Regions:
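Hydrophobic alpha-helical segments
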Residues: 1-210
Length: 210
């Protein structure tokens, strides 16, 4: 077929074929770059959401410790606890504002908000062990929600190994390591206030620290 064509027609046909190949390659490159851009944009959005969640978690852990002190009789901690309660409430609102509409409507986040509302309104009427337990359950739910945020924003799907390990440490390993220390601090605050410790409390502390 090519032999029957004039040179001008051959050049036009080859040029058209070459143009098609170039267009296909350009489309492939553009698609890959678009995916990278969208992935990067999602990751940046995830980091912007995780920052206030981390701050909220720390405030909740501190509120747990102060609550343990107050419920065990430390009157000097009442004002600090009240101030920390306002800080946590503001942090919860900041996280809610930072979340995407999809994440904001997730049952996991709504459960965290309900947990906090219950603690803020009823926490001082509970026994010290119950208060500690409810705080710890709430914080555990927050830590699990952090993983959900990371998954939804592709932070835990990063193909670059170094970045993946960094995100895994930030989202999973470090919070899992720090939370037992927070529980120990809360228990310790209560014990120091009461100035007494039972055998079961010794066992509980040992199990957390082991």
């Amino acid at each position: 077929l090519m032999n029957r064509l004039r040179y001008n027609a051959k050049f036009l046909l080859l040029g058209a074929a070459f143009l098609i190949v170039i267009l296909v390659l350009m489309y492939s490159v553009f698609s890959a770059l678009s995916r990278d851009i969208e992935s990067t944009r999602a990751e940046l959005g995830g980091l912007q959401m995780l920052k206030p969640i981390n701050q909220m978690t720390q405030a909740m852990q501190q509120h747990r410790g102060l609550s343990a002190g107050v419920l065990n009789g430390n009157e000097a901690m009442k004002d600090k606890r009240a101030a920390k309660e306002k800080e946590v409430a503001a942090a919860v609102m900041a996280v809610d504002a930072a979340l995407s509409s999809t994440l904001r409507e997730m049952p996991a986040w709504k459960a965290v908000r309900q947990d906090w509302d219950a603690i803020a309104s009823q926490g001082l009427s509970w026994t010290p062990p119950e208060n500690l337990k409810r705080h710890t359950v709430m914080i555990g739910n927050v830590l699990q929600f952090m993983v959900t945020v990371a998954d939804e924003t592709q932070l835990t799907l990063d193909p670059v190994m170094d970045t993946y390990y960094f995100m895994d440490t930030l989202v999973s390993k470090m919070p899992a390591m720090l939370e037992p220390l927070g529980i120990t601090r809360a228990r310790g605050t209560g014990l120091l206030t009461k100035k007494e410790i039972s055998q079961q409390q010794c066992v509980d502390l040992a199990s957390i620290l082991s």
